Amino acid sequence: MFDQLVTFLYTRDLEKSAAFYGDVLGLPLVLDQGACRIFKTSPEGFLGVCRCSERRPSNPEGVIVTLVTDDVDGWYERLKAKGVTFDTTPEGNVEYNIYHCFMKDPDGYQIEIQSFRDPAWPRPT
């Protein structure tokens, strides 16, 4: 097993995306590499936003970043109060036994806030 996970997203506007993840979502910035900023999402999970280039274009299609929490409703209300527009309200999904809602980041990446209702899901220790 690996020690940590970093997911990188490419952005056309690094300052706008960094403000969204840092100021709006409240994720702590752990490393500023100039063209990339890496935020902590959980004890060993990280999300990096990097300035796109011709070699690494921004391509949000087919990407979903899922942030897992037991407080989906609380996050929904807090982020709505900060002006975030959601694509869906929090709702249950019987097929996957989850409770979730969706929004998009400034580049159009789909962000899901989700809670697993399945007792088999490994909870943080």
Regions found by a protein language model. Name each.
Residues M1-D3, P57-G62, V94-E95:
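Short glycine-enriched loop/turn motifs at secondary-structure junctions
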Residues M1-E15, V63-V65, R117-T125:
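N-terminal beta-strand motif that seeds the catalytic metal site of vicinal oxygen chelate
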Residues F2, F8-L47:
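Core segments of cupin and vicinal oxygen chelate
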Residues A19-F20, D73-R78:
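Short amphipathic alpha-helices within nucleic acid-binding modules
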Residues P28-G62, Q110-S115:
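Conserved short beta-strand elements that form part of the metal-binding/catalytic scaffold
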Residues F46, T66, H100-C101:
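Short hydrophobic/aromatic beta-strand element in the GNAT-like acyltransferase core
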Residues K80-T125:
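Vicinal oxygen chelate
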